[in-house]
From Swiss-Prot:
Residues 1-23 are annotated as: Framework-1. Residues 24-40 are annotated as: Complementarity-determining-1. CDD domains: IgV_L_kappa. Residues 95-103 are annotated as: Complementarity-determining-3. This is Ig kappa chain V-I region S107A. Residues 63-94 are annotated as: Framework-3. It comes from Mus musculus. SMART domains: IG, IGv. One of its GO terms (biological process) is adaptive immune response. Residues 104-113 are annotated as: Framework-4. The keyword Hydrolase does not apply. One of its GO terms (cellular component) is immunoglobulin complex.
Length: 114
């Protein structure tokens, strides 16, 4: 199974500041056949289904604000929130869909810095 290592686990942030979340896969997620990285980022709020933010490592899903950006290649990927809003303070997960079983990072929780 592909292991997804996500960091940090917890992040205290200030509103309007830039945030970066990292994810490392235990093997490359790049398909030379399809020329795509099989890496996605999800946002998960309490009592709600996970929301797809980024697919193919860098493609923003329909309706996702442009403050969310995905980047990276091979095994190393990043989710950047350029200016964190209060509604962004929740859990984020990376996931690989290169091979079965599909596997997820352990998650990153964003909270407001006090």
């Amino acid at each position: 199974d592909i292991v997804m290592t996500q960091s940090p686990t917890f992040l205290a942030v200030t509103a309007s500041k830039k945030v970066t979340i990292s994810c490392t896969a235990s093997e490359s997620l790049y398909s030379s056949k399809h020329k795509v990285h099989y890496l996605a980022w999800y946002q998960k709020k309490p009592e709600q289904s996970p929301k797809l933010l980024i697919y193919g490592a860098s493609n923003r899903y329909i309706g996702v604000p442009d403050r969310f950006t995905g980047s990276g290649s091979g095994t190393d990927f990043t989710l950047t929130i350029s200016s964190v809003q209060v509604e962004d303070l929740t859990h984020y997960y990376c996931a690989q869909f290169y091979s079965y079983p599909l596997t997820f990072g352990a998650g990153t929780k964003l909270e407001l810095k006090r």
